[in-house]
Design a protein with these regions (language model features):
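Phosphate-coordination loops involved in phosphoryl transfer and adenosine-cofactor binding
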Residues: 1, 74, 149-152
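N-terminal glycine-/charge-rich "phosphate-binding" loop or analogous flexible N-terminal tail
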Residues: 1-56, 176
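Short loop/helix-cap segments at secondary-structure boundaries that form the rim of catalytic
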Residues: 15-22, 40, 87-94, 184-192
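Short gly/ser/thr-rich secondary-structure transition/capping motifs
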Residues: 27-33, 57-60, 133-140, 190-196
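Short acidic active-site motifs
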Residues: 34-38, 63, 198-201
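A short, aliphatic-rich alpha-helical micro-motif
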Residues: 39-43, 68-71, 148, 200-205
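Phosphate/diphosphate ligand-binding glycine-rich loop within oxidoreductases
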Residues: 45-130
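Rossmann-like dinucleotide/phosphate-binding beta-alpha-beta segment
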Residues: 142-205
Length: 205
């Protein structure tokens, strides 16, 4: 029976519930504060789910050569995010272990947050809030904000998150999009109606 092991907690517990309800899959949660029991479970694991954030994972659970020497049955490692800082991909590849990540899983949330911060700066929301809490009582004209409407927005990166920011700014605020991303195809720039530029020009504008 395939055995999936995950460390501590997962943000999407509904995913764990789905797997646990499959009678042909064994799902085991291990605790980072119980090394002996954890590695006993990992020794017979076929898949390991681990956070992508280095500061959230004790080094002993980083998937490197030392870790892999203790997990001989492993065939898949899954990173709980777009990154994979806790996984030595080269070491896994040498052993024929598949590494997967969750690219795009939080793109919508991050994109909306980025646009929210733009609006916060343009409308001076946080700045005004802090001063009001300190007793400021000046004229409202002192804090006139600016609109995002029809502004030119510069994006460094036009992947899952950057692309979604572009869509929100265009569809919601009629913005023009400048973008720098040397790894994205011209077709994607066209699809997102973004003007391709270099980093210096983007920062200048």
């Amino acid at each position: 029976m395939p055995k999936i092991v995950y460390l501590d907690n997962l943000p999407a517990q509904e995913g764990v519930s789905i797997l646990e309800n499959q009678n042909k899959i064994k799902v085991v949660k291990i605790e980072s504060n119980n090394l002996e029991q954890s590695f006993k479970e990992l020794e017979t694991a076929h898949a390991f789910q681990v956070s992508a954030a280095r500061d959230e994972v004790p080094k002993i659970f980083h998937v490197n050569e030392e870790f892999l020497s203790k997990t001989p049955n492993l065939i898949l490692v899954s990173s709980g995010g777009a990154g994979y800082d806790t996984i030595d991909v080269e070491a896994c590849t040498k052993r024929g272990i598949l590494v997967v990540n969750q690219t795009g899983g939080n793109a919508e949330a991050v994109a909306e947050h980025a646009v929210a911060l733009m609006l916060d700066l343009l409308k001076r929301v946080t700045e005004t809030d802090l001063l009001l809490r300190k007793g400021w009582s000046g004229a409202r004209e002192d804090f006139i904000g600016r609109n995002l409407f029809k502004k030119t927005v510069g994006l460094i990166g036009l992947g899952n998150t950057g692309g979604r920011v572009a869509e929100i700014c265009q569809n919601g605020f009629s913005c023009d999009i400048l973008a720098y991303d040397p790894y994205i195809s011209n077709e994607r720039f066209s699809k997102l109606n973004a003007k391709k530029t270099n980093l210096d020009e983007l920062l200048f504008k």
